[in-house]
């Protein structure tokens, strides 16, 4: 009798309180292997697998990640996105605090600009980004201005002035993954907000 060797697979989620089901994918069919809660280490033999991630609270969009085990241990990082329902809930919860901080420093945003999109980011829903476009005036270029805030010590702090382009060079103290996700999700061409 031949026993297939197994390898340690370390699965790490980018957010807390997530669970997942692991399926073996033979190409012809998939069969459930196990379920996990939170970051886990499991033993798997060589083959192709699918991890289907979810949250009991509905805070993330369900996510499928495919990976293969080929003769060695593997580290699998699972990146998830907040669900629209969760983001809407958090934005509504934070709106008055964010607006107070933002419009106190940049009153022209309230009077001369129109909010286009807003999102919640970060592993702990502690980043906020919004895009604004100048209201209807003769010189409206159509440019979109983005502003980013972070919740620090239970207070929202402005991390960027409203500007057209945010990069690692013209912003400080903003992780590259937050900048990248802000740019892709607030783009006027983005289908996921």
Model-derived features: positions:
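A short, solvent-exposed beta-strand micro-motif common in secreted/extracellular proteins
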Residues: 44-57
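Structured interaction patches on ligand/partner-binding surfaces of diverse proteins
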Residues: 32-36, 56-83
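Short proline/glycine-enriched turn/loop motifs at strand-loop junctions of beta-rich domains
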Residues: 4-8, 12-20
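A glycine-anchored, Pro-Gly-centered beta-turn/N-cap motif
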Residues: 38, 45-48, 152-154
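Short beta-strand edge/turn micro-motifs at domain boundaries
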Residues: 75-77, 147-169
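Low-complexity, intrinsically disordered terminal/linker segments enriched in charged
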Residues: 79-107, 123, 127-129, 161-193
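Short, acidic Ser/Thr/Gly-rich low-complexity loop/linker segments typical of extracellular
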Residues: 21-39
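Exposed beta-strand-loop-beta-strand "reactive/processing" segments of non-cytosolic proteins
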Residues: 51, 116-149
């Amino acid at each position: 009798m031949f026993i297939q060797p197994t390898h340690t697979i370390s699965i790490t989620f980018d957010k807390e309180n997530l669970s997942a089901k692991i399926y073996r994918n033979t190409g012809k069919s998939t069969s459930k292997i196990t379920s996990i809660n939170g970051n886990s280490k499991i033993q798997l033999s060589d083959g192709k697998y699918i991890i289907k991630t979810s949250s009991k609270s509905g805070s993330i969009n369900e996510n499928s990640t495919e990976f293969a085990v080929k003769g060695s241990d593997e580290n699998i990082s699972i990146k998830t996105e907040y669900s629209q329902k969760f983001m809407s809930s958090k934005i509504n919860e934070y709106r008055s605090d964010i607006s107070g901080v933002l419009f106190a420093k940049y009153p022209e945003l309230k009077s001369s600009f129109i909010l286009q999109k807003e999102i919640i980011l970060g592993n702990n829903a502690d980043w906020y980004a919004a895009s604004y476009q100048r209201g209807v005036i003769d010189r409206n270029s159509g440019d979109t201005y983005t502003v980013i805030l972070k919740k620090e010590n239970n207070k929202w702090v402005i991390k960027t002035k409203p500007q057209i382009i945010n990069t690692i060079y013209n912003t400080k103290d903003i992780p590259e993954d937050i900048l990248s996700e802000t740019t892709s999700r607030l783009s006027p061409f983005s289908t996921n907000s």
